[in-house]
């Protein structure tokens, strides 16, 4: 371990590995869940703080030949963290682009807390994207059809298909759980292939991971 003027250049510790694991799980869950999951604000903030900390250590170690090898390792860790964050955010933007109307409608109907579901940037993006798409459809399609058919009701909004099948794994033993009239004893060591909707609350509650 090298410390002092240049900070602690120890290998990645258990806390950092745990944070990396949480970030990867957030990305994979977002990737395989058909709906938009709550924005992992705490995890993202912690990861960004860790990136800034490592970047600061690397910058201060440039002139110290004894720390350059470890600094190079840190730079690789930084790039890995940035890559996973990028993948996570891209998955979310894809869903916002696809389901923007249903997301905003559910927020409007108080089905979701907007500040848990979306980051501040995502809220602004979703609203602006909807305004852009509404304007596009109005100018290219709706103006050319009778007014009686111009209004879009909630049934015509694109929504995620929640009955898709997914692979999932409990984070802990959950005991008996009712899934489509069948009782399943969820074990931490087992992997299941089930419809998403019955386990949606477990995924959103952090008790089940998608794989």
From Swiss-Prot:
Localization: Nucleus
Major place of residence = nucleus
UniProt-listed GO biological process terms: DNA replication; DNA-templated DNA replication; double-strand break repair via break-induced replication
Q: Which GO terms describe its cellular component?
A: GINS complex
Identify the keywords attached in UniProt to this record, alphabetized. Answer: DNA replication, Nucleus
Query: Entry's InterPro entries?
Result: GINS_A, GINS_bundle-like_dom_sf, GINS_Sld5, SLD5_C, Sld5_GINS_A
Query: What is the role of this chain?
Result: The GINS complex plays an essential role in the initiation of DNA replication.
Q: Which PANTHER family match?
A: DNA REPLICATION COMPLEX GINS PROTEIN SLD5 (PTHR21206:SF0), SLD5 PROTEIN (PTHR21206)
Q: How does it assemble?
A: Component of the GINS complex which is a heterotetramer of gins1, gins2, gins3 and gins4.
Q: Which family does it belong to?
A: Belongs to the GINS4/SLD5 family.
Q: Quote the protein name from its UniProt record.
A: DNA replication complex GINS protein SLD5
Source organism of the structure: Dictyostelium discoideum
The gene it comes from is gins4
């Amino acid at each position: 371990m090298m410390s002092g003027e240049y900070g602690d250049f120890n290998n990645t510790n258990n806390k950092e590995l745990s944070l990396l694991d949480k970030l990867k799980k957030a990305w994979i869950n977002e990737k395989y869940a058909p709906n938009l999951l709550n924005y992992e604000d705490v995890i993202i903030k912690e990861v960004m703080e860790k990136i800034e900390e490592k970047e600061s250590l690397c910058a201060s170690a440039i002139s110290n030949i004894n720390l350059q090898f470890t600094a190079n390792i840190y730079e690789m860790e930084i790039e890995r963290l940035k890559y996973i964050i990028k993948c996570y955010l891209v998955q979310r933007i894809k869903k916002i682009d696809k389901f923007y109307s249903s997301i905003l409608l559910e927020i409007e109907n108080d089905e979701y807390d907007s500040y848990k579901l979306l980051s501040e940037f995502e809220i602004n993006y979703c609203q602006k994207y909807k305004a852009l798409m509404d304007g596009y459809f109005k100018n290219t399609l709706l103006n050319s059809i009778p007014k009686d058919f111009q209004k879009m009701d909630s049934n015509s909004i694109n929504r995620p298909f929640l009955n898709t099948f997914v692979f999932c794994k409990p984070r802990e033993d959950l005991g008996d759980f009712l899934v489509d009239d069948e009782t399943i004893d969820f074990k931490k060591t087992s992997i299941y292939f089930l419809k998403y909707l019955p386990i949606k609350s477990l995924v959103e509650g952090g008790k089940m991971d998608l794989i």
